[in-house]
From Swiss-Prot:
The gene is XKR6. The chain crosses the membrane at residues 130-150, 159-179, 318-338, 372-392, 413-433, 442-462, 473-493. The keyword Membrane applies. Belongs to the XK family. InterPro entries: XK-rel, XK-related_scramblase. Residues 20-47, 84-120 are annotated as: Disordered. One of its GO terms (biological process) is apoptotic process involved in development. Residues 107-120 have a biased composition (Pro residues). It comes from Homo sapiens (Human). It is a multi-pass membrane protein. Residues 34-46 have a biased composition (Gly residues). It comes from the Eukaryota. This is XK-related protein 6.
């Protein structure tokens, strides 16, 4: 969700960075403007360190500025207005600060030698904003209807249902807010730059705290470092703000708003769009992980509970139905958003379109609704056996996931805990956790789910009370199986037509037709359209009859079909073929395989180190792991740190 560029500085959206060709720190000019100098101060005359304010807060001296603005926290506390740059005022340009060690400027590449960038993809920035706004609406609708329903149970005197409904709202929310605040503490307290020698919060490396902007050129001197009192006051205000936000259970809302702010800034401020993009991706990944955890701890149990209550009361009131629909929508939306962001975050995978994401929403809606209805029907009669069934299914799925081997976390015990959490997800729906062909695993999973749904539903049907359930027994059976079939149809539509790697239906159709028409595939070493070699015909001698008959028999045995397929060119790589030009930060550890997150998304120590490397190397344009393609090495990160 950062602004993409077609090489001419035209942003067409804030989706992932496929091919940015702006001259970031290259010393060249583009569209008449000097290339951004990053956080070390550049030719734009801005204050030193201002361009990196998303990562280095000027007053807090930290690499995680939670105010999301260019030191506005310090300016508001001290009553200072934003100062215009010297270049904008027509004054003298400040002295260029010395470059960071190992992060020198690269000479501009001649335009004739640079490859032509591909045409920009058609993306609309309002779609990205709308997607986040809809995610916020789904969140408020889910939590709001659950709280409203709990209050309604309390007014009616149903204290048991009130307690259960409120329990499935408050306990998951407290757990998720605690995890979110813990991440904030790790980022805010561990992201300081005091331990980095020669690095200050307002100037580039090796400048020191006494660097005065413009004083060396006779301009007005500006004090770089804020006072210690202002630093303490700003830190205290950040701590109070984040504490209040998380106590009000609004940590995810704040992260959604900050993600949208960073995405908009990445489209508006093209000279620093890479930094805004990285900061936005970190924030968006955090909020999606938190939402995924909360939905399966709160929305999924809440959905089963409300359906169970409606079956016990033998009535479907408006408020429980609305609460169930919003919980179901929250589950489907979070799963689709999670998988879309996961593909967007990896440069070795093509991003998912919004059409594909919407089809995924319907896929999850139908399959989860079929699963939950069968759960509620069975639990309305066999409460004890339903609990045993859920525990057994969770244990079996967790063992299956652990046995398959996943690579999501940084340690073995964290990986086992993650697999146990994914086992909870597998109670309700499919969740891909392993690279490779998923068709066989999905076929096995959905076969098991269909068998379980049918068994639970038919057991309820045969042991139900006909007097109270005849009015909805047959429609309930139809909903279970029709919803499951509709969900599988949506899944096939997604993988067959809207998958990011291309329509699978065309590939399967072409291979099947080739096998039906030819019987066997074309040998790879045969070139039927190859031209004759000059000079070879003149050296031939008239063959004898025996040799001619032998050659005719050989030709008849190896004859090729009349209609042949023209050889295709080299296949298009699955990832993004155009790598960004510029220095790269190398992480000396193997890259995790899809569908796992990259290590710098889940390891917060590594994320903080990358933030510091981005600060000391403002021209860095990408991150490469040890086993990935690398243009050239600039900085290395040892995995033992």
């Amino acid at each position: 969700m950062a602004a993409k560029s077609d090489g001419g500085g035209v942003g067409v959206g804030f989706a992932q960075l496929h091919n940015l060709d702006e001259a970031v720190g290259s010393g060249g000019e583009e569209d008449g403007e000097p290339g951004g100098g990053g956080c070390g101060g550049g030719g734009d005359g801005s204050e030193p360190g201002e361009s990196s304010s998303m990562h280095i807060c000027h007053c807090c001296n930290t690499s995680s500025c939670y105010w999301g603005c260019r030191s506005a926290c310090l300016r508001s506390l001290l009553g200072r207005k934003p100062r215009r740059s010297a270049a904008a005022d027509g004054g003298d340009q400040p002295l260029q600060p010395p470059a960071a060690p190992g992060a020198g400027r690269q000479p501009p590449t001649p335009s004739a030698a640079r490859p032509e960038p591909p045409p920009p993809q058609v993306e609309r920035p309002w779609l990205d904003c709308l997607w986040i706004v809809l995610a916020l609406l789904v969140f408020f609708g889910d939590v709001g209807t659950d709280l409203w329903l709990a209050l309604d149970y309390y007014r009616k005197g149903d204290y048991v249902y009130f307690g259960l409904t409120l329990f499935f709202v408050l306990v998951p929310s407290l757990l998720v807010q605690s995890l979110s605040f813990r991440w904030f503490v790790q980022d805010y307290t561990g992201g300081g730059l005091g331990a980095v020698e020669g690095l200050t919060s307002r100037g580039p490396p090796m400048m020191g705290a006494g660097y005065v902007h413009g004083a060396a050129r006779g301009g007005p001197g500006v004090r770089v470092s804020p006072t210690p009192g202002a630093q303490r006051l700003c830190r205290l205000s950040v701590w109070i703000w984040q504490s209040v936000i998380h106590l009000l259970q609004m940590g995810q809302v704040w992260r959604y708003i900050r993600t949208m702010y960073l995405g908009i800034q990445s489209q508006r401020r093209k000279e620093h769009q890479r930094r805004f993009y990285w900061a936005m991706m970190y924030e968006y990944a955090d909020v999606n992980m938190l939402r995924l955890l909360e939905t399966f701890l709160e929305s999924a149990p809440q959905l089963v509970l409300q359906l169970y209550i409606m079956l016990q009361k033998n009535s479907a009131e408006t408020l429980p139905c609305v609460s169930s629909v919003t919980s179901l929508m929250s589950l489907a939306w979070v799963l689709a958003s999670y998988h879309k962001l996961l593909r967007d975050s990896r440069d070795d995978k093509k991003s998912m379109s919004y059409r594909g994401a919407i089809i995924q929403v319907f896929w999850r809606l139908f399959t989860i609704s079929s699963r939950v209805i069968s759960f509620a029907l069975f639990a309305s009669i066999f409460q004890l056996y339903f609990g045993i069934f859920v525990v057994v299914h969770w244990c079996a799925m967790a063992f299956w996931i652990i046995h398959g081997g996943t690579d999501f976390c940084m340690s073995k015990w964290e990986e086992i805990l993650f697999n146990m959490v994914v086992g909870i997800v597998y109670i309700f729906c499919w969740f891909n956790v392993k690279e490779g062909r998923t068709r066989y695993r999905m076929f096995a999973y959905y076969t098991i789910v269909l068998t379980e749904n049918a068994a639970l539903t038919f057991l309820w049907y045969f042991y139900r009370d006909p007097e109270t359930t005849d009015s909805y027994a047959v429609p309930a059976l139809c909903c279970v199986f029709i919803s499951f079939v509709a969900g599988i149809a949506m899944m096939l539509l997604y993988y067959g037509v809207l998958h990011p790697t291309g329509p699978r239906a065309k590939i399967l159709a072409s291979s099947c037709c080739a096998e039906l028409l030819w019987g066997i595939p074309l040998p790879p070493d045969v070139e039927p359209m190859a031209p004759e070699i000059p000079g070879y015909r003149g050296t031939q001698v008239t063959p004898t009859r025996a040799v001619t008959e032998q050659q005719e028999d050989l030709t008849a045995d190896t004859c090729l079909p009349v209609f042949q397929v023209r050889p295709m060119g080299p296949p298009t790589p699955l990832g993004r073929p155009y790598l960004p030009e510029g220095p790269l930060i190398k992480i000396d550890m193997p890259r995790k395989r899809y569908p796992a997150w990259d290590a710098h998304f889940v390891d917060r120590r590594l994320r903080r180190t990358i933030n510091i490397l981005q600060y000391v190397t403002p021209t860095a344009v990408g991150i490469r792991y040890r086993d990935g393609p690398l243009l050239y090495e600039l900085l290395q990160y040892e995995s033992s740190l």
